[in-house]
């Protein structure tokens, strides 16, 4: 089985965890379950199928594909942050971030800044490109040689440290008819959360793309929440 995913990276292999391919009149009932995935994978795929419904389940990852850092201090030269290394494993090599997960490592390319309290993206920040000098200060604290005060970022705000890569969506619907997602929540993805392509009569009710309660995270999908390509109905 092979397929190409629009508007994403094109890795040689897309590891698929739940392949729902060549099926007719199938109902998947999650009963409110949380499906927790490991590594960079495509959790759900509906392909070359008709009248498949997925119901009452949530999708998340054991290790978020991005790393969240809480700002504790800013000045005109540096930004100090704290990172929970258990939740977001990383190493500092040659004074640069190397983020780690099951079967993958990657450096930093940019960050997004989220406001304390509201959880909104801080105005006029968007993706801020950076891969500069990092100095461990002991414990969970690090000093970044990066003046973020000039961007309006303050202590208490959250930086989502990320790479520009977007290898895999959270759920792919490909060459399928009459597919429905009912109360399906996509909490994290390394690309778009939901991608529907070359399909027709797709239906989604309830659920959506949102932070999973209790994680303390502010970020979900690596790109669009939903993306439709060559789809009708």
PLM region spans:
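Extended Gly/Ser/Thr-rich low-complexity repeat segments
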Residues: 58-60, 87-127, 148-170, 176
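Short, exposed beta-strand/loop patches in secreted or surface proteins that constitute
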Residues: 28, 66-76, 112-114, 119-138
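All-beta strand scaffolds that present successive hydrophobic residues in beta-strands
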Residues: 27-30, 52-56, 155-156, 178-183, ...
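Charge-rich, low-hydrophobicity low-complexity segments
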Residues: 146-150, 187, 192-195, 203-206
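Generic recognition of long tandem-repeat/solenoid scaffolds
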Residues: 77-86, 123, 132-149
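Long amphipathic alpha-helical scaffold regions
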Residues: 199-233
């Amino acid at each position: 089985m092979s397929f190409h995913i629009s508007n994403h990276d094109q890795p040689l292999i897309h590891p698929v965890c739940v392949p729902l391919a060549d099926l007719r009149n199938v109902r998947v009932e999650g009963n409110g379950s949380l499906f927790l995935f490991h590594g960079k994978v495509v959790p759900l795929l509906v392909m070359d199928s008709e009248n498949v419904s997925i119901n009452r389940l949530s999708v998340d990852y054991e290790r978020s594909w991005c790393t969240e850092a809480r700002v504790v201090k800013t000045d005109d030269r540096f930004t100090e942050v704290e990172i929970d290394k258990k939740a977001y494993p990383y190493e500092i090599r040659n004074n640069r971030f190397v983020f780690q997960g099951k079967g993958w490592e990657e450096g930093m390319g940019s960050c997004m800044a989220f406001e304390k309290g509201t959880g909104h993206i801080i105005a006029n920040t968007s993706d801020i490109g950076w891969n500069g000098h990092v100095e461990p200060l002991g414990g969970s604290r690090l000093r970044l040689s990066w003046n973020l005060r000039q961007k309006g970022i303050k202590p208490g705000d959250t930086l989502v440290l990320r790479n520009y890569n977007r290898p895999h969506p959270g759920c792919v619907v490909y060459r399928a008819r009459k597919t429905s997602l009912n109360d399906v929540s996509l909490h994290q993805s390394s690309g778009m959360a939901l991608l529907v392509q070359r399909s027709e009569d797709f239906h989604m009710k309830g659920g959506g793309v949102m932070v999973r309660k209790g994680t303390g995270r502010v970020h979900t999908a690596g790109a669009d929440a939903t993306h439709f390509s060559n789809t009708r109905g």
